[in-house]
Amino acid sequence: MKIYVDADACPVKDVIIFEATKAEIPVTLVTSFSHYSNAEQPKGVETIYVDSGADAADYRIMQLAQKEDLIVTQDYGLASLALAKGCIVLHHKGYKYTNENIDQLLQTRYLSAMVRKSGKRTKGPKPFTAEDKEKFRALFKSMIPL
């Protein structure tokens, strides 16, 4: 198993890195050049930089990921592609994407886009909380081999 993180706006990178390095599972953070950092990462953690174009990180993750790898993303499109490839896919708020819930998530995203396109406003996501982080930590730990 390898772990791939859609890292541009991921608020749980610290949790992923801590738990994965403890379990000696390699982590690849995929992020755009606009988030470039000189910060050193622990052994087993790699950062891949991609262009800032739309979906560049998603395409790179899909090139790298193999069946049964774990992917962390908030992007429903990437989650859908990764599920089709046989990957385990988690959202940073602590829920697992599944073949049973992805269609509804994609439909909701589409309907919200149509409402915005018509000039109306839609609610954004709720703020990320400490409770969300702990929910993610528990789910993440249950998904990785010890």
From Swiss-Prot:
Superkingdom of origin organism: Bacteria
InterPro entries: UPF0178
Signal sequence residues: none
Pfam families per UniProt: DUF188
Record family assignment: Belongs to the UPF0178 family.
HAMAP family: UPF0178
Name the record gives this protein: UPF0178 protein BT9727_2823
